[in-house]
Amino acid sequence: MELVACVDARPEALEAACDAGVITARQCYPSIGDAIEDQKTDAVLVTTDGAQHGDVVRAALRARKHVLVEKPFVESMAEARELVDQAAALNRTLMVSQNYRFFPAVRAAQRIVKGQELGQLLHVDIDFRRFAHVSHRLHWRHPLLLDMGIHHFDLMRAVLGREPRTVDCRACNPPWCGYSDPPEAAAIVDFGDGVTVSYRGSWLHPERPTAWAGEWLMEFEQGTVTWTSRGDRSGLRSAEGDAVSVYRHGTVPDRIALPHLELFDRAGALDAFTRALAAGTTPESTAGENLGSLALALGAIRSAECREPVQLMTSANSR
């Protein structure tokens, strides 16, 4: 993999990339059209603001490039389906970088659920707490439920191996906090067959912050599992802070060994993308697969706005 061009409408951003030694001035462009026309490229990495994702992804696909796009994919289901269909029609890979999947604690939790190592899963509690009263986040669209919550909603689907059926959410925006949209929320997500997830998230907690993936407690027939992932010191080759503990009924807690991963986080997502392109296979978290996570995030927002449960379409029938 080689970085051949950098696109940004802001000259100061391109200058900063050059100063950092990431790229040369000859490889900097003000628009994706200019870059694609001038450079030989196989794929495009889209890291713009979420509201701009659709236009940039559309332009890259139109030029027959594979695309890896930052989460959240886009801000509406209609646009998401349009881009998924466009990628399929052009036989291009379109993947969403749900980078929280690429951590060892997540893989261990997936294995425990899939292998029914403690019997059937019954219920999950997830808590996310951070204090992020910073100016650039105050005016983001739904800084918790969409921008941050998309990570947690995607992990629910990835770890449980199920699709959500309904979501009932309430959000809070205290008048003193300065956010345009609610920075706190609580939700109950029904995954069918008696499996529910209780989710609580907040950007207003200065004390006892959780890791970025949150604190998970999973209740099974034969015990419970607690885990957390993506601590503050996590990096491209580090998963410091990842931990999984298993509590079988009648036994002492056991902090289990975690699976080995070569790369983590965004590097893990990028590696999965490039490996899939090289092998001609389908990567994890394609845009089509990601429809379920986006539908859950947007459904939680709708539920919070109308203060009623919202029925969700699964990824199997959302097309």
Regions from the language model: what does each represent?
Residues M1-I23:
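N-terminal Rossmann-like dinucleotide-binding module
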Residues A9-A13, L258-L270:
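Active-site loop of classical SDR/Rossmann-like NAD(P)-dependent oxidoreductases
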Residues A25-I32:
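Conserved SAM-binding strand-loop segment of SAM-dependent methyltransferases
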Residues A43, D49-G50, G54-R101:
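Beta-strand-loop-alpha-helix segment that lines the small-molecule cofactor/substrate pocket
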Residues A43-L45, R81, G192, R237, ...:
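C-terminal helix-rich "cap/oligomerization" subdomain common to oxidoreductases
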Residues V69-E70, L94-V96, D125, Y199, ...:
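Hydrophobic residues in well-ordered beta-strands that form the structural core
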Residues Y100-Y179, A185, R307:
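Predominantly a Rossmann-like dinucleotide-binding segment in NAD(P)-dependent oxidoreductases
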Residues F153-S234, A267-A279, N317-R319:
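Contiguous beta-strand/loop segments that form the cofactor/metal-binding neighborhood of enzyme cores
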